[in-house]
Amino acid sequence: FDSFVERATYGYHVKSAGTYRLHGQGTFLGEQQLAGDTVIRSYAFDQPIPTYISAVAISDYAIHAYTHNGAYGEVPVTLAAKPANLNAMMARFLDLGTAIDVCEHWYGPYGFDRVGYVLTTDGALEIPTNVAYPQLMTGQPVSSNRGLYSHELGHHWWGCVVTPDIHNNMWLKEGPAEYTGHLVEEWIDGAAGLQKAVKDNLLFVLRQAHVNDDGFQALSPMPDPHIYGTHTYY
């Protein structure tokens, strides 16, 4: 099943060969060496989460790992990317610690084993401990990246914990996640930062939402053709 309502815990056991290794969700349990360069790597994810945000990442990842001192204790952090892309990724995640502080300040303690992001070929998704993060963003400005990784981090409260009952109420997780980026700007630049983020967002929505989504749409219930549109995500 693949839904917002069903929740489960997970065990991952993935066999791979060559330079490819599982970088999984949750806690690393170990690696079993098989014949040649084949291994089985195992992870356990013990917090119940909606089934649509369970995934595996398998490649020749290089890992940057460190610990952030959060408001409620230490928060392990991992950034994973192909070796050639890791430095560019790290250079654009300079304010991730600030985003963690903002989320814990407004939403409460971070509830998962680590904060983690993995570069992918396309798209972003709030996979807990292994957020899928588009590689193209490593060529974008620091501020654009800050908005996106803050959005995805906000989902670890709004989406991974608080979840809509049906896809037509997607606003319930996307609205607060997007606003998380605004709160991060406030943390960095004060009231002026928040006001600019909110006003820029409002102007974009007023100009573009009805153009992009075939007219003005109600947030709830959002018609199926426009669930992943501008109204929902901005």
Per-segment meaning from a language model:
Residues 12, 39-42, 60-156, 160-170, ...:
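Juxtacatalytic substrate-recognition/specificity segment
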Residues 1-59:
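Extended, low-hydrophobicity, Ser/Thr/Pro/Gly-biased non-transmembrane segments
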Residues 6-8, 39-50, 54-57, 92-99, ...:
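Alpha-helical structural motif
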Residues 174, 178-234:
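Acidic/His/Gly-enriched intrinsically disordered linker/tail segments
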Residues 20-25, 109-115, 165-166, 188-197:
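Acidic/polar loop patches that form or flank catalytic/metal-binding clefts of enzymes
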Residues 17-19, 135-136, 184:
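Short loop segments at secondary-structure junctions
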Residues 19, 50-52, 86, 106-110, ...:
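Short secondary-structure junctions and interdomain/linker hinges
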Residues 51, 124-129, 184-191:
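Secretory-pathway/luminal and periplasmic proteins that interact with or process carbohydrate-rich
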